[in-house]
Amino acid sequence: MTMQYDVKGSHLSGTGLMVSGRVRLKNLIYLGTGTAGSIDVFDTTTAPVSATYARSGYTVTVTKTAHGLTTGQTVGITYAAASNVSATAGNYVVTVLTADTFSVTDLNTGTIASSTNCIYSTGKWLTSYNTGTAVQPFQAIFSGEGILAQTGIYVVVTNISFQTIQYG
């Protein structure tokens, strides 16, 4: 493969859409605020949904009023930690339990109390980073051709001053 010369960038302070359309995420630079935070990257042009979850064994049960999902649908999801443990971020097929709850089968097992926060999207989850308390820029370079986003790159941040991406 030849060198790609049409790499572009996008910069944002806060949560939001970084770029729409089919692109490959090549590089991510972010700066923390001095408080531990997180950055979650999704393949979507719409804001991911905030919900709560619990895990028992391999089963993660997500609660969101009127979630509107159907059994067999795939969601990209990332989870906050409870007592330094979280469910495994990724892309999962859902089983609808009620109009307000659905479940996914985690890759790992354990117990996590209910009412722990999570974020999901009907687009794909691409990557996540938990940040420490350092106030210095960090860079994540994605090897090869980068991470493919079919729809766009939407970033959800907590305690992040800014993020910059390079894509092509």
Describe the function of each predicted region.
Residues 48-125:
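Small/polar beta-strand repeat architecture
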Residues 63, 137-146:
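Exposed aromatic-hydrophobic patches
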